[in-house]
A protein has these predicted regions:
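Conserved N-terminal phosphate-binding loop of PLP-dependent enzymes in the Aspartate aminotransferase
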Residues: 1-254
């Protein structure tokens, strides 16, 4: 399954499988903190959910039970205004371990936003993470990163990966990912340990999904079906005079 996964994602050199999205986004954050020796995590304020773990939930309105010191380790930026990202790196110079965002949500990147974010991460020594839970296996076979022609340091996948089976994946560059293994002399990272981690049905499902994606026009079908659904939705909204209450947004595939 690892070989099948890596064959799809350009620039990915290693993969670690989990069971849900929070498993792998939190693992990505741990790796980034270990790799950089920094504590702060920058998250996109316009993307609603990255993890059920403290590092993210502590930055939301439902943060009861999470220590203040943990909440203060997550900072936010806005999607598309590159000045928002620049301001964070200036305010927290040398302190940001990683930056995480989705390739896009209902708003597409403009003026080379994703590439500019990547350049800022490189310039400031921070790990660039793309959360592909929604875009992965929907917008492009190689994810939103392939669609937008950008290679992150780490990226996370799930949802459509196994067509509903419980599996997620963290993929990325070897120099970062290897810290979650045993073959290095640096301080070890406790990457993932899951109660049902040895369950293999979901991995078998993921393997078959990837094989189907390689031989069938699944992505094209989703774009067509989503386009038809969106068109019908907009027509129905106008027909019933609901434009102030409902709207259709985002890419047809998602």
């Amino acid at each position: 399954c690892a070989e099948e996964m890596l064959s799809l994602i350009e620039g990915a050199e290693m993969v670690k499988f989990g069971k849900n999205g929070s498993d792998v986004t939190s693992a990505a954050v741990r790796l980034a903190r270990a790799y950089t020796g920094r504590d702060l995590v920058a998250v996109c304020a316009d993307h609603p959910f990255f993890s059920g773990d403290d590092w993210f939930i502590g930055s939301t309105p439902i943060s009861a039970g999470i220590p203040k010191v943990t909440q203060e380790l997550t900072v936010k930026f806005s999607y598309n205004p590159i000045e928002s990202v620049q301001a964070l790196f200036q305010q927290y110079s040398g302190r940001i371990a990683c930056l995480i965002l989705e390739p896009e949500k209902e708003t597409a990147p403009v003026d080379g936003f994703l590439r500019k974010v990547q350049e800022l991460c490189r310039k400031n020594g921070s790990v660039f993470i793309l959360d592909e839970m929604i875009w992965g296996f929907r917008g492009h076979r190689g994810g939103g990163q392939r669609y937008h022609q950008i290679i992150p340091d780490l990226s996370t996948f799930g949802k459509a990966l196994a067509n509903g089976f419980s599996v997620s994946a963290l993929v990325g560059k070897r120099e970062i990912m290897r810290l979650g293994g045993l073959e290095h002399e640096q301080e070890r990272v406790f990457l993932l340990s899951l109660t049902h981690g040895a369950e293999t049905h979901s991995l078998a499902a993921a393997m078959e999904v990837i094989r189907i994606y390689k031989r069938e026009p699944v992505i094209e079908m989703m774009w067509r079906a989503g386009g038809g659904f969106g068109k019908g939705g907009r027509e129905s909204i106008c027909e019933h005079s609901f434009p102030d209450h409902f709207k259709v947004f985002g890419k047809p595939c998602c």
